[in-house]
Amino acid sequence: MLFLIHCTQKPDGQAIRDAHYDAHRAYLKASPVDIKLAGPTVDDAGEARTGSVFIVDVPDRAAAIAFSDGDPFTANGLFESRTVTRFLDITRGKPAFGPAKD
């Protein structure tokens, strides 16, 4: 099952992110979870990190929460909120509407 995990960073969280970035990356690389998509959310200027998003393929919601709980960012208090939502990939990993037109 696919789950979307959306974590919102605390406004003063950049120091926490910086301090635990290497451990976060190592956790993601070592995780047995099938991570389909992952990355930070950013402000409109694309400069400041505002949170993180993951789409993971796991057996159930409990596994998605356990994956997120094990992330050093979560464990060290970077996030002020988190949502875990079941996700349906209607594109099956392919662009749904063809290539973007300029």
Model-derived features: where do they sit?
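Conserved, structured core segments of small domains
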Residues: 1-102
